[in-house]
Amino acid sequence: MKFVDEASILVVAGDGGNGCVSFRREKYIPKGGPDGGDGGDGGDVWMEADENLNTLIDYRFEKSFRAERGQNGASRDCTGKRGKDVTIKVPVGTRVIDQGTGETMGDMTKHGQRLLVAKGGWHGLGNTRFKSSVNRTPRQKTNGTPGDKRDLLLELMLLADVGMLGMPNAGKSTFIRAVSAAKPKVADYPFTTLVPSLGVVRMDSEKSFVVADIPGLIEGAAEGAGLGIRFLKHLERCRVLLHLIDIDPIDGSDPVENARIIIGELEKYSQDLAAKPRWLVFNKIDLMDKTEAEEKAKAIAEALGWEGKYYLISAASQLGVKDLCWDVMTFIIENPIAQAEEAKQPEKVEFMWDDYHRQQLVEVEEDADDDWDDDWDEDDEEGVEFIYKR
């Protein structure tokens, strides 16, 4: 299946149903009074994370999602039916952004997590709500409020503990094949990897971590060269980055300059990402003598001003790979994911019915002083009106 990590969709919540103007009319009951019911609330639009999905390709074709409108109220104090909700399923790791405001509405990081992205409209009130000791035959009602409407950007960001970055043909895909069951394509030409891939590294029956491989970066990636830097977002949730450096590039390029290019593109993309823990890993040491490899790695590290630890491995022959993986595992155990902010309770929207009624009644009384016929709402073609006649 094609990997798609971005999609734009339109979500529209249902409008609230209108209230009804109706009067009870039965034999032998000449003054039955008002019996117009309230409308129903509009349906909501929800996002739900599903671990069985791994791409947003479905939303390249289906771009509009609309919840059901609440039904109008009816006579005999019948309340309109609430509109049905719409649930949009997305892969775990999806970020939801409101394109109108640029606000991040939420990150879907757990299976089954739900996020309200469009709230349905409130229902309108029937004329029964306006009955009082001084208004025995109210002919007023209110219409339902419109539901939310939003243009959303969905961004899929892979959930991994370890992220790999480097130039094309640095050996990233070979490494992930060596340490996990993932089988990304490996070949002797640049940009063999076209989409991100994940691999689970199992150290023993109880210890494991997830590593992410993304397409290689080249100079000018921030301006769109090569495959650009759009895949770097998949590393934002990683706890440590493995910067793979081809210790002896077959094209004769300078490993120091190659490393600086990666660091520069990383900083152009995000200072936060550039500040993440990053380990230097010199790959393909099987192509030269051990002593020569150690001396060359030391020279490269000094040229980069690198003061931390670095690793020498050969992903193809798995030389030094196991030690690196155990060090990664130890780092992950010693640096657990920071406790996310306390799970925010869904925002509770309290609709103050007493205040709402009071406000509506005040408006009705003000209108009644000017013209008793002003509140018939003749523009509402959907509302049901039954008027008691003598």
UniProtKB/Swiss-Prot annotation:
One of the Pfam families matching this protein, by short name: MMR_HSR1
Recorded GO CC terms: cytoplasm
UniProt binding sites for Mg(2+): 173, 193
InterPro entries linked: G_OBG, GTP-bd, GTP-bd_Obg/CgtA, GTP1-OBG_CS, GTP1_OBG_dom, GTP1_OBG_dom_sf, OBG_GTPase, P-loop_NTPase
A GO term, aspect molecular function: GTPase activity
Binding site for GTP: 166-173, 191-195, 213-216, 283-286, 314-316
Primary subcellular site in the record, as a coarse category: cytoplasm
Keyword Hydrolase attributed: yes
Keyword GTP-binding recorded: yes
Top-level class of the enzyme under EC nomenclature: hydrolase
Disulfide bonds: none
Obg domain residues: 1-159
Cofactors, names only: Mg(2+)
GO biological process terms held by the UniProt record: ribosome biogenesis
Localization per record: Cytoplasm
Residue span of region Disordered: 127-147
Biased composition (Polar residues): 129-145
Enzyme nomenclature, EC number: 3.6.5.-
SUPFAM superfamilies tied to this protein: Obg GTP-binding protein N-terminal domain (SSF82051), P-loop containing nucleoside triphosphate hydrolases (SSF52540)
Domain OBG-type G: 160-333
NCBIfam families on file: Obg_CgtA, PRK12297.1, PRK12299.1
Family designation: Belongs to the TRAFAC class OBG-HflX-like GTPase superfamily. OBG GTPase family.
Subunit structure: Monomer.
Name by which UniProt lists this protein: GTPase Obg
Species of the source: Salmonella gallinarum (strain 287/91 / NCTC 13346)
